[in-house]
Amino acid sequence: MAGPLWRTAAFVQRHRTGLLVGSCAGLFGVPISYHLFPDPVVQWLYQYWPQGQPAPLPPQLQSLFQEVLQDIGVPSGHCYKPFTTFTFQPVSAGFPRLPAGAVVGIPASFLGDLVINTNHPVVIHGHTVDWRSPAGARLRASLTLSREAQKFALAREVVYLESSTTAVHALLAPACLAGTWALGVGAKYTLGLHAGPMNLRAAFSLVAAVAGFVAYAFSQDSLTHAVESWLDRRTASLSAAYACGGVEFYEKLLSGNLALRSLLGKDGEKLYTPSGNIVPRHLFRIKHLPYTTRRDSVLQMWRGMLNPGRS
């Protein structure tokens, strides 16, 4: 066992710079490629296909999206390609400043009858929605958004794409890897472990790797929380109507999650909290801000706009 382990350690030591550069390039390239080439990938994943055919974007949704772009003041040279998605929330990817542009998936439920029709079967997590039940009626009501709430949901995606924060997220992993490697090598030299026993060096490297992952997880979650909070505040600041739509959007989102919690039974209790937030999948991490926190933030902004003297 010592032979292969020594050979592996010697190989890593001999090619450590190349391995580091290759690993950093891979950690940056894989997530960023999703946004550099969004047109075929995102539409293939999220396109709404009623009756086996991709649904074209209806004129009313196209008009709604163009209105959002005008409200935000997006330059005419930025490229956006909206399409109809089967999801209940908008999806987006890409860089609007680049030639490939950005894509934004607009939920078919924004039209109302396409998905919310009680004669149209909907399966969620393996459970067919019973629209006649109280929870089914609540879910149906949560999918019916006002024009202001729809505009808030779309504007939030456009603001995110215009900010190019995707590149910052993609840079975080390689930056943490390079930082962990540099600090680990420096600590080995400082403590005199570089020429010490291999077992001791391996143990130190393992501790450094764990510390690096913890730093990455904390940085990733903190950045995500900051971006989500900024997106809500930036979108709500467009006007009082957008802020009001944001409050409705998150209220309907929480109401829909509570309906799903009831419809899915025990599976729903594992997915959603009694307040409608998503149950964290990791014990020591909260990857996203709770929806209640985001709703309260937008609600506070809306109240401040209605009563500027009290803000």
Swiss-Prot record:
Keywords: Membrane, Mitochondrion, Mitochondrion inner membrane, Transmembrane, Transmembrane helix. The chain crosses the membrane at residues 18-38, 167-187, 198-218. Belongs to the TMEM177 family. One of its GO terms (cellular component) is mitochondrial inner membrane. Residues 39-166, 219-311 are mitochondrial intermembrane. InterPro entries: TMEM177 (IPR026620). It is a multi-pass membrane protein. Found in a complex with COX20, COA6, MT-CO2/COX2, COX18, SCO1 and SCO2. Interacts with COX20. Interacts with COX1, MT-CO2/COX2, SCO1 and SCO2 in a COX20-dependent manner. It comes from Homo sapiens (Human). Plays a role in the early steps of cytochrome c oxidase subunit II (MT-CO2/COX2) maturation and is required for the stabilization of COX20 and the newly synthesized MT-CO2/COX2 protein. Residues 1-17, 188-197 are mitochondrial matrix. It is found in: Mitochondrion inner membrane. This is Transmembrane protein 177.
